[in-house]
Amino acid sequence: MADPLGAAGRLPAVFMTPGTSSFADFLSRSAPHLLPGARSGLPGPVTEVAHGTTIVAVAFPGGVIMAGDRRATQGHMIAQRDVEKVHHADDYSCVGYAGTAGVGAELIRLFQVELEHYEKIEGSTLSLDAKANRLAAMVKGNLPMALQGLAVVPLFAGYDLDTGKGRIFSYDIAAAKSEERTYESIGSGSVFAKGSLKKRFRSDLSQDDAVRISVEALYDAADDDSATGGPDVIRKLYPIVAVVTADGYRRYADDEIEPVVTAIIADRSTNSGG
């Protein structure tokens, strides 16, 4: 195997050449084959891959909640019951994805490194708008793969330190970015989740209320969309729920979400019509 440091034990020139503070730009110069969208040229559309499904985000005074179901599907089969589709992006933001699971996970990892790399190089963090724009550029880079069936779209949310508010950004496969002021959902169950959120959202939601309606929206999506997984009480698999406020990012523990799920199931048992 060739020595990556070379005969003299030095790093290759690409590592020493001044460039931008973007890790994705550096990767495109030094190892472009490692970028998520670099593997185009497939013989045809790809279908037999796992897909992540429904993510929701809800803004409330003082922050934002993001929640995702745990199911990944492959065709008509359940590929995984405990997949995690909501992730920490940096100290004041989170990101989730819907679509091809492998590409989505790779995109999230690259985005996390991108934000960390910028902070280390520049000694400061990107603004929330700049983070959203960096993510849009990565989504655009995956367009060739998306056109061959390996599509993934993220949902990005965070706490804006400049305005003191939680903000939500959604994307399409061509990287068009939209800011949602109240709530948003992506994935196969999003139409049902949005309908649920539309009925329950209020501008004065508390953090606990925002968690409740987010989990309830996923419950409603799972009720009508077979690709969205509902809470699995037997296996103790509950939605991944994260909050971002002025105190930063925090993921809720399962034992915090369990009573929320229990309360929803109890309420639904007395109102079987939903």
From Swiss-Prot:
Top EC category: hydrolase
Catalytic activity, EC: 3.4.25.1
Gene Ontology BP annotations: modification-dependent protein catabolic process; proteasomal protein catabolic process
Prosegment residue ranges: 1-52
GO cellular component: cytoplasm; proteasome core complex, beta-subunit complex
Key word Cytoplasm present: yes
Active site, renumbered: T53
Cross-referenced InterPro entries: Ntn_hydrolases_N, Proteasome_sua/b, Proteasome_suB-type, PSB_actinobac
This protein's pathway: Protein degradation; proteasomal Pup-dependent pathway
GO molecular function, one term: threonine-type endopeptidase activity
Keywords: Autocatalytic cleavage, Cytoplasm, Hydrolase, Protease, Proteasome, Threonine protease, Zymogen
Highest taxon of the lineage: Bacteria
Pfam families named among the record's database cross-references: Proteasome
Protease listed as a keyword: yes
Activity regulation (record text): The formation of the proteasomal ATPase ARC-20S proteasome complex, likely via the docking of the C-termini of ARC into the intersubunit pockets in the alpha-rings, may trigger opening of the gate for substrate entry. Interconversion between the open-gate and close-gate conformations leads to a dynamic regulation of the 20S proteasome proteolysis activity.
Catalytic activity annotation: Cleavage of peptide bonds with very broad specificity
CDD domains for this protein: proteasome_protease_HslV
Localisation per UniProt entry: Cytoplasm
Free-text function comment from the UniProt entry: Component of the proteasome core, a large protease complex with broad specificity involved in protein degradation.
Family: Belongs to the peptidase T1B family.
Record note on quaternary structure: The 20S proteasome core is composed of 14 alpha and 14 beta subunits that assemble into four stacked heptameric rings, resulting in a barrel-shaped structure. The two inner rings, each composed of seven catalytic beta subunits, are sandwiched by two outer rings, each composed of seven alpha subunits. The catalytic chamber with the active sites is on the inside of the barrel. Has a gated structure, the ends of the cylinder being occluded by the N-termini of the alpha-subunits. Is capped by the proteasome-associated ATPase, ARC.
Name of this chain's protein: Proteasome subunit beta
Organism (species): Frankia casuarinae (strain DSM 45818 / CECT 9043 / HFP020203 / CcI3)
